[in-house]
């Protein structure tokens, strides 16, 4: 499993980037968006631990390093950024095989741990990608985390007691 995760998450991206880079540089306005997972931050902890193995987590952490390195290599003709996904439709969220294997309590634990109290939608991902492509011409080497606040956890900020500054 470890080798499969490294091959599909890191090696495949590198091969595509190396082949595409000359063409992207020639265009003068190339954009690369690396898709990654919050597994690179949370690993096997909390409610997400039932989805992510160590190889997947390590590979996704590595994507962030590739994003920063490739941003340096591509600049100024090519912008390279990363969209780090949490639990979204078609990727660990509702409607996926993994989601279907969870008990109701496990699903609720994931939702409760997410500040936005839901999984993401494909429309959420599309909006983020369009922003990165069209509306962020000065952004490169950046990780945009689209996780509904999962990494922050479900803890809310308590009100301060009266008289405390």
Predicted features, each with a name:
Residues 1-6, 32, 110:
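Substrate-binding pocket helix/loop in short-chain dehydrogenase/reductase
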Residues 17-18, 68:
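A short, exposed helix-loop element centered on a Lys and neighboring polar residues
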Residues 19, 27, 117, 134-136, ...:
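Generic structural signal for alpha-helix termini and adjacent loop/cap motifs
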Residues 25, 31-62, 67-75, 87-88:
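Catalytic loop of short-chain dehydrogenase/reductase
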Residues 47-49, 87-113, 153-165:
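A glycine/serine/threonine-rich, flexible loop-to-helix segment
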Residues 64-67, 73-90, 95, 139-146:
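Conserved Rossmann-fold SDR core element
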Residues 118-146, 151:
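C-terminal substrate-recognition "lid" of short-chain dehydrogenase/reductases
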């Amino acid at each position: 499993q470890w080798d499969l995760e490294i091959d599909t998450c890191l090696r495949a991206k590198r091969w595509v980037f190396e082949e595409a880079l000359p063409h992207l540089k020639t265009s003068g306005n190339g954009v690369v968006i690396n898709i990654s997972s919050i597994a690179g931050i949370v690993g096997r902890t909390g409610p997400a631990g039932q989805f992510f193995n160590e190889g997947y987590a390590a590979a996704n952490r590595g994507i962030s390093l590739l994003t920063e390195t490739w941003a340096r290599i591509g600049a100024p003709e090519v912008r390279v950024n990363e969209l780090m996904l949490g639990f979204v439709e078609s990727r660990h969220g509702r409607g996926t095989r993994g989601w279907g294997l969870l008990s109701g309590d496990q699903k609720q634990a994931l939702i409760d741990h997410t500040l936005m109290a839901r999984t993401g939608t494909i429309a959420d991902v599309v909006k983020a990608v369009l922003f990165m492509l069209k509306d962020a011409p000065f952004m490169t080497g950046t990780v945009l985390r689209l996780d509904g606040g999962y990494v922050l956890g479900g803890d809310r900020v308590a009100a301060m007691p009266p008289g405390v500054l």
